[in-house]
């Protein structure tokens, strides 16, 4: 087994990545596969933090456009990430991986409230820490939460799992000839207006020198390849 190039990672999983072909909810087979891939990393000695989106269950911004108060919609979206976190924690436990679910806001009896020093302690003990509830504030995406938690826990990289193989010069779904980038600078992304993540999240990562790696979690084994330094996905630094 190859040696990992990262000691501690923050893995950002979108809610859509959990829904499979169903188009809504959680596909148990995908959840179990992700848990096993994370287990591989723990066996390699990598410390893993996870941030989950909630778009498979609820999208606050979409309902805000339909007239719902944006703050209410975002609060509902935050709760959706907790539901995904509970499912991921359960899948990890079934795979015999120690995992702790933390929320950005209090949910007594369901999960722990986010505590920075406790999270660091658990990561050092090789327990997977799942950060749910976004940043705890409305108007911030779960990409912002991923970059924030990644910076806080001093991760070596934020790994953004998507449905495509990395960052392209245009939408590969619309243009089969789209060019995949292996490496980019933060300036490249802004100048070319490439869609990596929302600007607030991206500039947070840039300002703190946090590398971002975008890859396709749908490819079995891709997570291991990313962590062992193989040319998988796009690295932005």
Swiss-Prot record:
Belongs to the UMP kinase family. InterPro entries: AceGlu_kinase-like_sf, Asp/Glu/Uridylate_kinase, Uridylate_kinase, Uridylate_kinase_bac. PANTHER family: URIDYLATE KINASE, URIDYLATE KINASE PUMPKIN, CHLOROPLASTIC. One of its GO terms (molecular function) is ATP binding. It comes from the Bacteria. Keywords: Allosteric enzyme, ATP-binding, Cytoplasm, Kinase, Nucleotide-binding, Pyrimidine biosynthesis, Transferase. This is Uridylate kinase. Its EC number is 2.7.4.22. It is found in: Cytoplasm. It catalyses: UMP + ATP = UDP + ADP. Catalyzes the reversible phosphorylation of UMP to UDP. HAMAP family: PyrH_B. Residues 20-25 are annotated as: Involved in allosteric activation by GTP. GO terms for biological process: 'de novo' CTP biosynthetic process; UDP biosynthetic process. GO terms for cellular component: cytosol. It is an enzyme of class 2 (transferase). CDD domains: AAK_UMPK-PyrH-Ec. ATP binds at residues 12-15, 55, 59, 162, 168, 171. UMP binds at residues 54, 74, 135-142. Pathway: Pyrimidine metabolism; CTP biosynthesis via de novo pathway; UDP from UMP (UMPK route): step 1/1. Allosterically activated by GTP. Inhibited by UTP. Homohexamer.
